[in-house]
């Protein structure tokens, strides 16, 4: 299931510069800023590839997906595995996390496997040797610019519980390059099994 979220237009997104100063913008304004720099890349001091990476990082860090991921996870009646982009996002999404800097990762995975906890947030893709019994729901924050890796992550999540059907929820921002990445990541999957949800209005249900 692909969930299409609008970028927020409210100017409540606070960014901190390398010099330490802060300024307030909106998710939409910030995305437009990076897109305009890319469109005029021939006059920009930064290389095109650097600008692409900076725009991708901006998309990965907008808070709207974090709010929506929590909202979506709260709707699940079964245990859910959350794939985030970095350690901070994982820690914000769940009490129990699985990532390289968490010394309790394996213990948390054991609790999740046993059904003692219902939510586990991870950063990196789980290794091929890991299987999770009774896992039917996964939520992926971002498809990344590498569509092959994104497709592998989706396929891996679907195979974590090989004996049963699983549902993968993939979050994407409307009217951004995010949608292109998702489309390319899903090219190898059966279109009949892919559905789309416009997540407009969800922010009325989610605390900022």
Named regions from a protein language model:
Residues 119-123, 127-145, 149-152, 165-171:
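A short beta-strand element within the Helicase C-terminal
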Residues 79-84, 88-130, 149-150:
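Conserved helicase ATPase core of P-loop NTP-dependent helicases/translocases
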Residues 194-208:
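Long, largely alpha-helical accessory region at the distal end of helicase-like NTP-driven motors
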Residues 1-5, 13, 96, 139, ...:
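Hydrophobic/aromatic beta-strand patches that form the interior of the parallel beta-sheet core
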Residues 28, 66, 147-151, 179:
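Amphipathic alpha-helical transducer elements in NTP-driven molecular machines
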Residues 1-76:
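Interdomain helical connector at the RecA1-RecA2 junction of SF1/SF2 helicase-like NTPases
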Residues 156-187:
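Conserved segment of the helicase C-terminal RecA-like domain
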Residues 9-11, 88, 126-127, 143-146, ...:
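Conserved nucleotide-binding/hydrolysis micro-motifs of P-loop NTPases
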């Amino acid at each position: 299931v692909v969930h299409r979220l609008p970028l927020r237009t409210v100017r409540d997104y606070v960014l901190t510069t390398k010099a330490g100063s802060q300024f307030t913008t909106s998710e939409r304004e910030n995305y437009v800023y990076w897109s305009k720099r890319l469109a005029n890349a021939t006059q920009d001091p930064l290389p095109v590839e650097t600008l692409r990476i900076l725009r991708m990082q901006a998309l990965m860090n907008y808070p709207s997906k974090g709010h929506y991921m929590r909202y979506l996870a709260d709707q699940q009646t079964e245990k859910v595995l959350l794939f985030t982009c970095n350690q901070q996002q994982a820690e914000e999404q769940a009490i129990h996390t699985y990532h390289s800097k968490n010394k309790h990762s394996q213990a948390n995975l054991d609790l999740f496997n046993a059904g003692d906890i219902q939510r586990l947030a991870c950063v990196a893709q789980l290794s091929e040797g890991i299987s999770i019994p009774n896992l039917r729901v996964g939520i992926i924050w971002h498809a990344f610019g590498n569509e092959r890796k994104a497709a592998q992550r989706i396929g891996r999540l679907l195979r974590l519980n090989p004996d049963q059907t699983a549902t993968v929820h993939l979050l994407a921002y409307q009217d951004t390059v995010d949608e292109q990445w998702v489309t390319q990541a899903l090219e190898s999957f059966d279109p009949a099994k892919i559905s789309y949800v416009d997540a407009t209005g969800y922010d009325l249900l989610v605390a900022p």
